[in-house]
Amino acid sequence: MGPSWNVESNDGSQIAGYELGGSGEVLLIAHATGLCGAMYQLLADHLTDRFRVVAFDFRGHGDSSGSSDIDYGWDRMAEDVAAVTEHLGAETIHGFGHSMGGAALLLAERNVPSTFASMFLFEPIVFPDDVSKEGQNVMGLAARRRRAEFDSRADVLYRYAGRPPFNQVRAGFLAGYVDNGFAEQPDGRVRLKCLPEIEAQIFENGRQIELSAVQHLTTPIAVAVGRDEPGPNPARLGPPLADALVGGTLFRYDHIGHFGPLQDPWTIARDLVDHVAKASGSNI
């Protein structure tokens, strides 16, 4: 899927946007680190009867700008969100954010209050001020070890389908990632669009975002978490965030993990629609 449009972020980075279908109030999807906007089409398919669903690629991802000299701080990610919402120019925008995408939506709302009428965030990476950020260090190290090039898209699909985390997601999401998250090279091989070094920088920059930066927000915000698992786990960040937010509500899902929206899009879509309806006081 090629971009539906492009918009310029504050520093000149080009941000690619995707119209995923539907009409009505806008639902903006903000993807997780290392992924891309277009691969969330299967989630959008459960929402297009209620919303005009739009996704985009953060800088360093998909078809957006991704050179090594770009600033990948999460404040810059929030500026990418702002560029997209300004481009959309819609009266009402609801946000869905996954992991880093959720944190970026929160920062964008902090910077410009009332950007979003409501938000549904799955395991946004926002640390309590007194909690160790070691998990992001581990993720950065792991990202740098990722293989960047493969013989073909079929090779990627075969390899990723047999190992975590992509062996846990619906096949359509993995296919969307392989189609949209890799670029063909002159020799016929394919290469990650979000290169390992850039992904690592983004993970490491996530340590900058703390709860005190966003806890004052009054927007109706659902914070959703999957099951608690051994080791550094973003699910543990959700309850303190939901408790601290003025308009926060916590959703728990014991049957899915950090890639939950890609594992059970129907349940996530159902609860998102219910959350938006309660936030707006309507039956959409």
Range-by-range predicted roles:
Residues A183-D243:
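Conserved serine/cysteine hydrolase catalytic core
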Residues A16-G66:
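Conserved HGGG/HGGXW glycine-rich cap/lid loop of the alpha/beta-hydrolase fold
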Residues G97, G101, L105:
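Gly/Ala-rich beta-loop-alpha elbow adjacent to hydrolase catalytic centers
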Residues E149-N205:
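Conserved alpha/beta-hydrolase catalytic His-Asp/Glu region
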Residues Y253-W266:
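Catalytic histidine-centered segment of alpha/beta-hydrolase-like enzymes
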Residues R110, A117-E149:
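Flexible "cap/lid" loop of the alpha/beta hydrolase fold
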